[in-house]
Amino acid sequence: MAHTFLLEIGLEEMPAHVVTPAIKQLVKRTADYLKEERVDYDEIKPFSTPRRLAVLITGLADKQRDISESVKGPAKKIAQDAEGNWSKAAIGFTRGQGLTTDDITFKEIKGTEYVYVDKFIAGEPVATVLAGLKDVITAMTFPTMMKWSTHHFQYIRPIRWLVALLDADVIPFSILDVTTDRNTRGHRFLGKDISIATAADYEGDLTSEFVIADADKRKSMIKTQIDKLAADHGWTVNVDAGLLEEVNNLVEWPTAFAGSFDEKYLTIPEEVLITSMRDHQRFFYARDAQGQLLPTFISVRNGNDHDLQNVVSGNEKVLTARLEDAMFFYTEDQKKTIADYVERLKTVSFHDKISTMAEKMSRVKAIAGVLAKHVGLNDAQTKAVLRASEIYKFDLVTGMVGEFAELQGVMGEKYALLQGEDPAVAQAIREHYEPISADGALPASVPGAVLALADKFDSILTFFAAGMIPSGSNDPYALRRQATGIVRIAQDQQWSLPVADLAQAFVAAETTANVAPKLDQAGQIDALVNFIKDRIRKILRSAKQRHDIIDAVTAGSSSDVLQIFTAADILASHADDANFKDVIESLTRVIRLAQKAPAEVAATTVDPALFENDSEGQLHQGVATVATAAKDGLTALYTALADIQPVIAAYFDATMVMAKDDAVRNNRLAELSRLADLALALGDLDQLVVK
């Protein structure tokens, strides 16, 4: 007979962002537990609200699956003496399996006989197994945990009730002072406590008490209600998926409603209005048919439509107060010049161990100058990025950003335009924060991309020099995110960024401009390179790149971000070539021999007069061809290296590299060093797994 089982964890209200990952965790842990316990079922259906996490398991078997297994014991020579008497080891083994020595058989494994017993394990009734779900509940983890009352146990929020019903029967267990029963709670204000007769009644019983327990169904209701309100008023509402998810996890019985605010607030930049509505009040904003922001909003109440107008009025008052503050700051901020704000940055700390924010901008200007020249900006672009670097943090000390910190950069652009700055300068100010997440939008403009790189390079270098290098999960200054941003911008713009060389140039430029911090930045360049390479590894892993290719390209001598990605693509694209194994093995042999050459030998010029066979001359010509091809990029380099593989093989067949004659040996090592240096541009090829 198939059964239905309900498990519900009743809690005080959870933070909205926790609900979805929590229910996913409960489903997975439950499924893993049932699999481990050999219990078959058809489906696990999740239910979640701010006050509950629940799973309904249907098609549940009567009991665990029976199993028969053959258990290996000690070797026969240990289990029996010469007369065939059973040893204590054999007797203890069979007793531990609930059997006797009469049940022993022998099996030979690699020439040695071992004791075996065949063991039958009857499945336990499902009711017994389900009581173990207590451990599933207590094993759950959350981003933040709390204790309550006098208990030492920690959970996301205090557990207030537990329901565990197998069909109509309660499965008894307790967590702290809460014991399972069949009683659950309806909506906090509209419903009442109820007793569930059978597990299958759960969803329907809660609906009757104003709780939509199915999160997907509740989300669909919210979306439908918002769409209807928008259609009724002729609005266009972009229902942001993230906001919809958050609102869905704040309510149990959703009722959407529309509100409005005074049109005078539309003079404020719409980013401020949207931030106030979406981020601070969790409102959905509306636009007209022309895409203009309207003085209206849609919100969702956790309740029914009773006294809804009072709810509308209350929400309008809260939003109006916030917008009134925004209008005040917007007006007051415009009474000062950008120069006034930049002056104030001289008293604002970037970090007390590093510098002020004004000093950071001076460093970033020096770095931006190096980058502008390196990536080939034209005069107008260079002028824009240098001007932006002089002022790009000014909005941090405006009243608006003080109130709406998430608008830093955005308000910088708005105020810069109002004060007559070049639009390219204003855009760069906004874009320098990008990307703000691992997959966030990237700077759209070239000056913005350069300023973003300069700002991020400065932050990482100075924090490293101050000894604040991320370790483990600890990264309070988001340096990993900034390093990822550097990598993604380089990819997006297709800019060569040799990190080691550039970092040295940055430090030199700061020193020349007399803006270098009193920190040993030069001593952190190797750490910076490795830090950037760690981010490259992560991005390549996310792209499902082969692990050996990742190891090869990031262990190579190059610190050029774009070159490393290009090398990975090239190696991956040729990995299935018929000659790939021969090419890599030949080049690896070259590299290993070249590593035996002292630095002064590797740097010497190859002398053809010292060649003793034709293969040396052919290799010499081949290396010259590869060197020429390398100037056209890594793709041409790999093709040339692959083309001379037969030449390399013939060379090794005919030539003893480590000749007794010093001059001949050093000449050969110098040749191989030239070829190895070219091959290493693709990475440490010895890391590749070739078959």
From Swiss-Prot:
It is found in: Cytoplasm. GO terms for biological process: glycyl-tRNA aminoacylation. Keywords: Aminoacyl-tRNA synthetase, ATP-binding, Cytoplasm, Ligase, Nucleotide-binding, Protein biosynthesis. It comes from the Bacteria. The keyword Protein biosynthesis applies. GO terms for cellular component: cytosol. Its EC number is 6.1.1.14. The keyword Cytoplasm applies. It is an enzyme of class 6 (ligase). GO terms for molecular function: ATP binding; glycine-tRNA ligase activity. It catalyses: tRNA(Gly) + glycine + ATP = glycyl-tRNA(Gly) + AMP + diphosphate. Belongs to the class-II aminoacyl-tRNA synthetase family. Tetramer of two alpha and two beta subunits. This is Glycine--tRNA ligase beta subunit. It comes from Levilactobacillus brevis (strain ATCC 367 / BCRC 12310 / CIP 105137 / JCM 1170 / LMG 11437 / NCIMB 947 / NCTC 947) (Lactobacillus brevis). The gene is glyS.
